[in-house]
């Protein structure tokens, strides 16, 4: 569902406007899953294909084109998709967005070390890599 926005002070945009990556990842503490933001239709599509759950999207209103249209078709119809001008999005990020799209996703639980080791044939431990 497309929702036009004209300023960044709307509470629905908190995840995009007020929280950094660390704060997003810890948002549901003590539940360690949290959230992350994917940028660009290609990265968003990869996250969707990896079964991450989208929460909302922020999209440049001028980038609703073939690539974004294909992406929008992958998203649930009920997903809030906030649309804004390039100038407004640039004021948020400080730079021109690649293909004008950001998408908020829920993080998935990661495999435990025990599970990874149980499934692995060979394991490498790297330390102090520069």
Annotate each language-model stretch with its function:
Residues 49, 109-130:
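RNA substrate-binding interface of SAM-dependent RNA methyltransferases
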Residues 2-23, 30, 80, 85-116:
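Extended, non-globular alpha-helical segments
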Residues 52, 75-78, 119:
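Short, well-ordered coil/turn elements that cap or connect secondary structure elements
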Residues 1-68:
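Boundary-proximal intrinsically disordered activation/regulatory segments immediately upstream
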Residues 59, 72, 105:
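Flexible, acidic active-site loops/lids enriched in D/E/S/T/G that coordinate Mg2+ and/or position polar
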Residues 35, 55-57, 80-82, 100-103, ...:
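Structural motif
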Residues 66-78:
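Short, aromatic/basic amphipathic alpha-helical patches
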Residues 44-45, 68-69, 89-90, 111:
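A generic local structural motif
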């Amino acid at each position: 569902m497309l929702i036009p926005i004209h300023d960044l002070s709307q509470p629905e945009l908190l995840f995009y406007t007020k929280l950094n990556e660390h704060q997003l990842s810890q948002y549901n503490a003590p539940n360690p899953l949290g959230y992350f933001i994917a940028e660009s239709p290609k990265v968003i599509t990869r996250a969707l294909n990896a079964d991450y759950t989208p929460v909302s999207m922020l999209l440049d209103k001028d980038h609703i084109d073939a690539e974004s249209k294909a992406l929008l078709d992958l998203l649930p119809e009920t997903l809030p998709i906030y649309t804004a001008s390039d100038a407004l999005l640039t004021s948020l990020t400080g730079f021109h967005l690649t293909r004008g799209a950001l998408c908020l996703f829920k993080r998935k639980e990661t495999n435990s070390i025990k599970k990874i080791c149980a499934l692995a044939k060979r394991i490498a431990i790297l330390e102090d890599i520069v």
